[in-house]
Amino acid sequence: VEAASAAGGGDAGVYAHVNYHSSRAARLAAGACAEAVRGVVSGRHDRAYCLVRPPGHHAEPNRAMALCLFNNVAIGARVAQEQGLRRVMVLNWDVHHGNGVQKAFHEDPDVLYVSIHQDGLFPPGSGTITETGSGEGEGSTLNVPLPPGSGHEAYLTAFTDVVVPAARAFR
């Protein structure tokens, strides 16, 4: 990301084109998420919502992907752990599977990653129901792939019937 941006632009990863300003924008977005988490954990803020670009859930630990240069969500979750939170839950509520977040925490039993997304859309082959984590993190990944065309009701049902019980069990 840094090298491609410093060169004035180009490819920084799979479907991750950048220009001269991209690296700085991505660092500011990731930093905003990290600071928001620190603010909430310290009690300085009751809550935080980070409306940042570029997005992050496709960026993998060692590569940019699909317009995502750094994984803002994964960075925020790691900051929460560094600030002393024993358990962190990440919910991906999107048409796309957040493969980068899943990859970042696949072996971490202290981060529950739940993704509600359209089955088979992007990235191809990612976010299947059989992907549940590995090693010590086995069972810490929960994918809820919905059929194409699923509307609000399907997402809400998945949330109430799958996400809420998983969150309660993880506590």
Segments (PLM) and residue ranges:
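HDAC/HDAC-like amidohydrolase catalytic core signature
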Residues: 1-171
